[in-house]
């Protein structure tokens, strides 16, 4: 989303606040610009990549590891390490992720089920970075896929296309240990993925990346505490019978427990590796700080207006303000 569009949204919200006699004691004078999202460089490859979950090709060995994942709110360090790598060629976008886990388990096998009810790995892709029309991909250790397309974030009353399927999608799992076997201690499980550019082009209208292009992408790992019942893994429950909350470990932290804030996703820069002495370096967009600040204002005003409309009977409007 361009800065001019953000300014228009925020200005409109401020005017509406005045018209509805809403007030706030909060001052925007000391607003702190949110921390810049993570960044990563994806290298071009000419090597044939076999999607077997192992990532053993030379191209993968030379690809950069991401920073280790952190808690979604940005402070706590996860108990198990998670990292990813990325590559691309003329036909596909590739992902490889490695997740430490002493107990690797899964139960869901049906496509497009709610995969995050198991431990899973998730990818969010917004090619043009406008926070709208993005895809979400989830996989568990059974390689069960849930792929969905969102026209906009949930905060804006999104239309979720759960029936959407990524054409030509490939993935495979490698387990260093045993799946669903509580009698031993496992090492890690890994996911390898290939997404054809043609699928992105057909669904999003985005062509194959060119050198220097940057996309907004983020990654999440959902991890549950478990109970063992008759040798089988189940999500752990509390004393009242409810499930304990899951852990959400992510690449670029969101600040809140919500992955659907695309403006906070990381930057992935597409490049060709020249040699060890001439590594490409990522540079944030010139307006990055301004865009982050404008989005923080947009979210604050949206929440304030919706809360005010609900509480003031003098202004009998039902529903909420949308983007």
What are the functions of these language-model segments?
Residues 2-11:
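Bacterial N-terminal signal peptides that target proteins for export
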Residues 311-323:
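Periplasmic/extracellular, small/polar-rich flexible segments of pilin-like filament-forming proteins
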